[in-house]
């Protein structure tokens, strides 16, 4: 068994949905969110996973039932008749920790939304052991003259690039982010295999899994999620079959 595996250690949000800034700690890679129906457990979890695994932010990713009713920018800006907000910048991130050692790695997404405009996003991986909210902050502190309170102004993409420096990567596209997460955390030989893993997680999280999927369908889902074998891995089997064929031919003669 491989030692020192990465475990989910902490999740964080800044300026997203009803959160100004919040952290959620995992225990041995597990997180329990408690609350009454409608308190936001599902929205919080689905805004983090699987979004932060591959960077895809389509509406069906944010709803376990696959609904496309609400977009990521809706959660960032809030409902217009409830919140008088026309633009907002926020961050989502996941922090991983090596088992048994003080080694950390963080993956995250920056989001900027304007009412009636397309969502802007950028992605980052922090791999020099700095931690969000400790050695690196996703905001710039500012003092408000109006209410006399300190404000936290989220960093722009350029500001984040300057903060991260050589201790990580800040990229502009979802595909680049997916490849970085796979490279630094999961180690699949190709991104396609990693994408299949994420698809499997999405299928298995369905609240109606036991109702809608027969055992044969679940078997098919799990089978399709298995990585394909390379020619090198198949060679011993093909060699054995060829040897068996040759032996049979010799016996027949």
Task: Tell me what each language-model feature is.
Residues 1-160, 191-192, 200, 221, ...:
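Extreme N-terminal "head/tail" segments of very large remodeling/mechanoenzyme assemblies
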Residues 149-253:
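Extended, Lys/Glu-rich alpha-helical coiled-coil stalks
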């Amino acid at each position: 068994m491989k030692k020192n595996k990465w475990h989910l250690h902490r999740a964080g949000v800044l300026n997203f949905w009803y959160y100004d800034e919040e952290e959620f700690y995992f225990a041995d890679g597990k997180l329990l969110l408690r609350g009454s129906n409608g308190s936001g457990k599902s929205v919080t979890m689905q805004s983090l996973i699987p979004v932060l695994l591959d960077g895809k932010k389509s509406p069906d990713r944010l709803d376990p039932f696959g609904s496309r009713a609400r977009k990521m920018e809706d959660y960032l800006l809030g409902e217009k008749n409830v919140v008088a907000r026309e633009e907002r910048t926020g961050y989502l991130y996941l922090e991983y920790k090596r088992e048994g050692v003080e080694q950390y790695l963080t993956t995250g997404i920056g989001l900027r939304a304007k009412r009636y405009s397309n969502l802007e996003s950028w992605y980052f991986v922090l791999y020099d052991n700095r931690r969000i909210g400790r050695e690196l902050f996703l905001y710039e502190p500012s003092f408000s003259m109006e209410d006399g309170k300190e404000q936290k102004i989220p960093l722009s993409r350029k500001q984040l690039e300057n903060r991260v420096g050589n201790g990580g990567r800040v990229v502009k596209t979802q595909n680049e982010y997916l490849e970085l997460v796979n490279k630094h955390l999961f180690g699949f030989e190709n991104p396609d295999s990693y994408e299949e893993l994420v698809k499997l997680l999405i299928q298995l999280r369905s609240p109606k899994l036991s109702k809608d999927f027969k055992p044969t369908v679940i078997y098919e889902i799990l089978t399709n999620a298995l990585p394909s074998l390379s020619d090198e891995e198949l060679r011993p089997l093909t060699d054995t079959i060829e040897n068996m064929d040759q032996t049979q031919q010799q016996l027949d003669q």
